[in-house]
Amino acid sequence: MKKALFAGILASFFFAFTFILNRSMHLGGGSWVWSACLRYYFTLPILWAVLLFQGKGGLGRIFREIRRQPLTWLWWSTVGFGLFYAPLSLGSQYGEAWLTAATWQVTIVAGVLLTPLFGHRIPMRQLGWSMVILVGIFVLQASTAAELRFEELAQALLPILLAAVCYPLGNRKLMQYCPPEISTLERVFGMTLCSMPFWLVLGAWGVGAVGLPSAGQVIQSVGVALFSGVAATLLFFWATDQVR
């Protein structure tokens, strides 16, 4: 449990880079569409290369698993990654990095409250500690948030709240369907791959709606892919594996 908690805290640290870089890309004129899509466009080849270098038959194992239940993988990968990161990027466009980071912590409570969907009772002790953490975060940010208009808060908070629910939901549903031999790295790669139809459609829409991304946004997206798409996601999913 202590290792899982430490991994979760470390994942939050890496996620913080995402909020800062997303806000920076927005202030630089970049669209949330490309902030979202480029992260996964870059994350996929990075994870592919890691699995290839690692050997141990990981790529073949995850491809066989996806072929065994393709619709399950497509659906829950879209929920866990598509409906997580697209709304998160949209919310980051309307809110400061501190507001996005604080609101994102709702995912701690959301993960606990989703427990009955997987045939288990809500662990009240974990829920209690999660609520303490969440309340503490919002108390620290309340005075600054009070200075914002309701419209600004709603535009930032609603997409982030959706993301905070979809992220643990998609992850834990696929944990149910994956056999034990599928590692965390393999599952993250599989979800990234199977969410690609969503990102390709969103990217095609983005070309027509906002044009192509700038070179600066592309470069910053590589950083997001490394910090959030690889490091934070692997740590978060590994921590979830440890406590399931």
Where are these regions (language model features)?
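A helix-boundary/kink motif common to multi-pass secondary transporters
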Residues: 30-32, 96, 123, 182-183, ...
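Specific alpha-helical transmembrane segments that line the substrate/conduction pathway
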Residues: 34-41, 88-121
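Hydrophobic alpha-helical transmembrane segments in multi-pass integral membrane proteins
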Residues: 83-89, 137-149, 195-210
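Transmembrane alpha-helices of multi-pass small-molecule transport proteins
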Residues: 28-83, 110-114, 132, 165-170, ...
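Hydrophobic transmembrane alpha-helices of multi-pass small-molecule transport proteins
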Residues: 47, 125-144
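Glycine-/small-residue-enriched transmembrane alpha-helix faces in small-molecule transporters
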Residues: 1-38, 78, 90, 135, ...
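Specific transmembrane alpha-helical segments of multi-pass solute transporters/efflux pumps
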Residues: 14, 19, 52-104, 139, ...
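Helix-helix packing/entry segments at the starts of transmembrane helices
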Residues: 11-12, 38, 99-106, 173-196, ...
